[in-house]
Amino acid sequence: QHDEIYFEELLEEPYWGGSKTNLIDTMFYGNYYLNVYDVASNQLIYSRGYCTLFWEWQTTDEAKTTQRCCSETVVMPFPKNDVRIEISARNKKGKFVKKFEYTVDVDSYFIKKDRRMQYPTYDVHYTGNPSRRVDIVLLPEGYTADEMDKFKADCKLFAEGLFSLSPYKENQGLFNIRAVLAPSQESGVDIPGEYIWKNTILNSSFYTFDSERYIMTYDNKSLRDLSANVPYDFIYIIANTQKYGGGA
């Protein structure tokens, strides 16, 4: 199977939710790996392993007969000086092979700074400095403006469920959970197998990869733009539906 990575744009977001000191990923998890090097010294200053929806799609039957593209984003602390970004993919032998390289001029006027999806936010569980916490952002999918109170209540249920389990229960003080109050035009989510289509803010859908219970969004850019309302490490989508399902 073959994959290629193409550059689209650079965007400076208002917040960084990750650590400001622990910047090098030494675990080497995931099927892709981001390395960021200082251009002047060639020193590695940031790295992170991750997985993509595209990689998961490559394992499907559809990938055997057609080609497809997926939006992908990588995030990093905004650098002080010019950097070189390298993205590698894990091959069949488990080794990372470089697929993409791009040099970022930090003074370039092509680095966009627009806030694309600004909405109010809601603190579900806040304990302190984002750089020293695990920051979770909860995004609403298929909640209309009249259903924002329902979304807040569902966010509280999420937090209660998370902190009812170990080791989260013992470490509640190390977590922040925030929600973005972003309404959809219609209530509910897409269920293609039942011919149900909804106009929602993140374009999530059941039947991802033709798996009935798999709900996911291909709209990666909206996902990131909506999350950018708060500092975050992890993104969860709360879907307004009675149908059982999920995805990761």
Where are these regions (language model features)?
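Short, surface-exposed amphipathic charged segments that create phosphate/polyanion-binding patches used
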Residues: P192-N199
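Residue-level detector of short, conserved catalytic/binding motifs and their immediate flanks
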Residues: Y32, V83, V134, F175, ...
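Beta-strand-enriched, solvent-exposed domains that form extended recognition/catalytic surfaces
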Residues: Q1-F110
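A generic structural signal for short, solvent-exposed coil/turn residues
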Residues: T26, T66-R68, P77-P79, G128-P130, ...
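Sparse recognition of residues in long alpha-helices and their boundaries
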Residues: Y50, L174-F175
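Fold-level signature of zinc-dependent metallopeptidase catalytic domains
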Residues: Y109-E170, A179-I191, N203-T208, M216-T217, ...
